[in-house]
Amino acid sequence: MVIKCPNCDKNDFKSVRGLNCHISRIHPSSADGRGLRPSTDTRGRRDDKDIVVKDITCPFCDKNDFKSERGLSCHITRMHRSSSDGKGPRPSTGTRDRKDDRDGARPETLTPRHEDHERHNSDRDVVKGIAKVQRDSLQKGSPDNILLKDGARPETLTPRHEDHERHNSDRDVVKGVAKVQRESLQRGSPGNILLKNDAVGAKPESRPAKYKESPKQSRTTEEPHDRPLSSLSNFILSFNAPNFEKFVKMIEGSIVRPREDSTLRTESVNKFIDDLKVVMERISDIPLKLLKSGSYYDKTKIDYNNEFDFMFYADIKMEADFTNCPPGYCKIRKGVTVNKDLDPFIDRNGYLVPKLYKSHMFDIFEKCRTDPSFRKGRRTQLQDRKPESPAYTLLFDLGIPDKSPIDIDLVPAIRISGWPKTKDAREIQTGKWIDISTAKKAMECFHVVTKQFPEAHPDTNLLWRVSFSHAEKELILHADLSDKGCRKNVFKILKKIKENMKSKNPTEMDKFCSYHLKMFILGFYDTHSDFSKDQKLDMLKKGIEQLAKCVREGAIENYFIPKDNVLQSVPEEERRYVVRELEGLLQ
């Protein structure tokens, strides 16, 4: 039996359902209601349930480069909205060219940089609006409103019913689309917001319509252009994800960085440090060596490479004295050496005074930065830091338009060979995730920095803060070496969550930092064995729960010196805020 379309004479249908789908999609009701409008240049599909149109032409403006019926539907809705007199669509004027077939008119206030963001978000809202209208139609139970999943109509419908159903369906879709667009413009589409990271190629992700806003969050969306500039993920995570898995995907998506920009920044900083070392060898009266530390070098960077840490330590043999020192601190005295370069900074008892050493090292850094032969130093600016800060911080301008400057911390330090000779320090144990070679290399040395002890102590002026930057770097860098698991990924997600909490309310979160997370995560690795990639979500949930518990109790052990509570400097009010945010993620 030959099944033939009465409008375009197409006769290669395999069933009546295929013909019905063809008629409803290719020959929708005309605006005047007198019958069906013929369509041309169609081709058969692989089955009778899925009809693909080869050339789809707009009946109002003859635009014919649509890729799908959805593109045509969105085009008609946006470009040829129904007139107020009810006589049918009217052509739209004054619109500009779009990149996408589905693009519609945008508010005249949008700039070209905003268009791509707003266009994507608006298209997504349109699709969801159409789906909602169709679901509502099914819930009403009216046979005239029924639309099957594959586009076919029930065989019990008569042609008269089909025309009426098509008319109602088209009208409901147009109304639904218009409503979605109005709501999107009223609440401030994410596409209208220009984020700080746009300068380096970052694009904001659209906000799904089903995400609910809390009253506090909704206030930040009323005036989108007045929102404080922040990272991409801070905007995304201001809305509640429908489930934990999607929340994690949103976090991971926000961690991705453009490789080209990352390489540019890293190469620029490495060149800066290489040139600085050349100048330093000529100016410094102390032999210095370099340790590259920080998240970039242990491969856990979560944002753009805009912060780098470098330790410069005297290449002189020194010894650590832990006698009568609080956990995590020690005194430094001269070892067996004939070098006298540090003698001016040693007191009468033979101990190296942190403040004197720090002041002298800062002078060396400043002389090198301002030396005429150091050209890159001309693009730096000294940043103000708190007196107790152990770092000499520079703001390094890349000299490239639209590229933000980089924070570079130069930290004076002393290197001590071997592992701390104190019962308070725990040796790194091999086993679950640490192999012998990693443990051996991590315990080769440790460092001390000029960070002052926050409490009263008889030897306050002689205390140095013990730093395990070398060991931390080795352990984190090789965390997944044994089983190719997800340890580093869990750590990076926790760091991103912490950054989002800080950006959300920077006034309430000042002391809690990545160092606290690092001490927590190393202990977490020891207490959990299965970090296979398919356990990532489960491990992340357990990590958030355990972290919230530790912060609530006000105690996170220093992984290397268990008696040292690294949270002791974090105020109770700030800890309560962190706990509240962490527990909110699991709800």
Curated annotation (Swiss-Prot):
Map out region (Disordered) in residue numbers.
26-48, 77-229
Q: Which Pfam families match?
A: Mab-21 (PF03281), Mab-21_C (PF20266)
Q: Which organism is it from?
A: Magallana gigas (Pacific oyster)
Zinc keyword on record: no
Top EC class, one word: transferase
Q: Which reaction(s) does the protein catalyse, per the Swiss-Prot or TrEMBL entry? A: UTP + ATP = 2',3'-cUAMP + 2 diphosphate
Keyword terms, alphabetized: ATP-binding, DNA-binding, Immunity, Innate immunity, Magnesium, Manganese, Metal-binding, Nucleotide-binding, Nucleotidyltransferase, Transferase
The role this protein plays is: Nucleotidyltransferase that catalyzes the formation of cyclic UMP-AMP (2',3'-cUAMP) from ATP and UTP and plays a key role in innate immunity. Acts as a key sensor of double-stranded DNA (dsDNA), the presence of dsDNA in the cytoplasm being a danger signal that triggers the immune responses. Directly binds dsDNA, activating the nucleotidyltransferase activity, leading to synthesis of 2',3'-cUAMP, a second messenger that binds to and activates Sting, thereby triggering the immune response via activation of the NF-kappa-B transcription factor.
Under the heading Gene3D superfamilies, the entry gives: 1.10.1410.40, 3.30.460.90, Classic Zinc Finger (3.30.160.60)
The gene name reads: cGLR
Q: What is its EC number?
A: 2.7.7.-
What name has this protein been given in UniProt?
Answer: Cyclic GMP-AMP synthase-like receptor
One GO biological process term: innate immune response
